[in-house]
Amino acid sequence: FRISPTSFYQINHQQTEKLYKKAIQLADISKNDTVIDAYCGIGTIGIVASKKAGKVIGVELNSEAVSDAKINASINNIKNVTFVNADAGDFLVEYAKNAKADVVIMDPPRSGSTPEFLNSLLKIKPDRIVYISCGPDTQARDIKMLVKGGYKVTACQPFDLFPHTEHV
């Protein structure tokens, strides 16, 4: 994978691989599924998901990361992924007007997602949502909103990407 200096990438490769494997397993993706990879960074989760999905749309605000994601899809010969340079909340508000997704994998920053994103997520009603977070407090806040919208938590799996530190 290509990673530019301003792009985000998990530095603990061994744990990241386990995290992505579990996320894809929990997403239960099939060849007919449309998957949104929100807050996609350099596209790693979406590229991994693309091997099982019909179509993947990665959304990321950092334009350099989107450039990396497109290159990463190309060098991995992935054809069923599209990357969009946009705020995930703004993108989902527009997307919810005309389209549906079967699966949304979201990996927002430590500050969590936005009410606009979460409300739009509730409008498109994906069958499955996988929420990856490094901020348990903001994840709990966001999940509370999703639960109020009709979703239920079926699994929770911690991964220690920063061993021997206070970071989750």
Residue map of PLM features:
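Rossmann-like S-adenosyl-L-methionine
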Residues: 1-168
